[in-house]
Amino acid sequence: MASGVGAACEELPPDGTCDECEPDEAPGAEEVCRDCGFCYCRRHADAHRQKFLSHRLAAYVHGAQAWTPPASGDDALPEDVEAKGEAEGEVESEVGEEESESEVDSESEEESETEEDSEDESDEESEEDSEEEMEDEQESEAEEDNQEGESEAEGETEAESEFDPEIEMEAERVAKRKCPDHGLDLSTYCQEDRQLICVLCPVIGAHRGHQLSTLDEAFEELRSKDSGGLKAAMIELVERLKFKSSDPKVTRDQMKVFIQQEFKKVQKVIADEEQKALHLVDIQEAMATAHVTEILADIQSHMDRLMTQMAQAKEQLDTSNESAEPKAEGDEEGPSGASEEEDT
């Protein structure tokens, strides 16, 4: 295997193997460098060409003079010059491609980094926006819940006051106990109009000159009336229907008209009985109200008497205290005056 350049190469001619490979494993040479005189296999020839761009490589011919060192750069063969130019162009193109690829890679990396940074920033901004939106939503939900709770409480209060049947019934009972014209308690009964009135209605109201009665009298009169009118009307209705239905001359239409007329009579009797029962209830309620009013009036008068007695007792106590004070002062002066006289 040859080594060295110039004259050294003349003393040690090439042995036909690659000078870069190991001697025991060196394959046959395929190219030879005209500048340094070394022989190379295909792989090391490519590596040598890329490393030394100015060196000229040619095909190695086994059994012949592989190369002769050139006298000067001008004596270089045109083929070698062209091969050198082509090699340099290929190397430059490869280097340019590598540089362009590296530039493209760097640009793509920068763009990807920029995109990642922008994505991170956008993610952070979106997270902040989402947190703010969540806080705003929570605040708005809390306000809505408070407003709903207040509105529900108000609605429940209004509903209780508006739709409570007990309150409505009590209001109706209170309104029924008062005269709609004068606002006084219903304490008298008008026999002509069959209506409860106050004490001012027969004096300055619409019941002047009417026959009146007390609540107790009206209640006893209504209760003592015979309530068998409804029963008698029903028995009479049944008998008349039997008699009418047994008449063969009565048509179906006539029977329908007859039934309607008879039931209207019974309905009138039922309405009278209903009105009577309602009057009894109203009179009882008015009597109870009057009784309670009397009891309250008695209690109030009793309390007034007690208050008067307490005031009188307090005045007497104050008077006795005032009369006792001068006497006590005189008793205190008495012993002191007596002692002074004894000293004199």
UniProtKB/Swiss-Prot annotation:
GO MF assignments: ubiquitin protein ligase activity; zinc ion binding
Xref: Pfam families: zf-B_box
Coiled coil: 290-325
Zinc finger (B box-type): 174-215
Sequence positions that bind Zn(2+): 179, 182, 201, 207
PROSITE patterns: ZF_BBOX
Compositionally biased region (Acidic residues): 88-165, 330-344
Keywords assigned: Coiled coil, Metal-binding, Phosphoprotein, Zinc, Zinc-finger
Record GO biological process: innate immune response; negative regulation of protein K48-linked ubiquitination; positive regulation of cytokine-mediated signaling pathway; positive regulation of defense response to virus by host; positive regulation of DNA-templated transcription; positive regulation of non-canonical NF-kappaB signal transduction; protein stabilization; regulation of gene expression
Positions of region (Disordered): 69-165, 309-344
GO cellular component term, pick one: cytoplasm
Modification Phosphoserine, positions: 336, 339
Taxonomic superkingdom: Eukaryota
Assembly: Interacts (via coiled coil) with TRIM17 (via coiled coil).
Function description: May play a role in the process of differentiation and maturation of neuronal cells. May regulate the activity of TRIM17. Is a negative regulator of PAX6 expression.
Stated name of the protein: Tripartite motif-containing protein 44
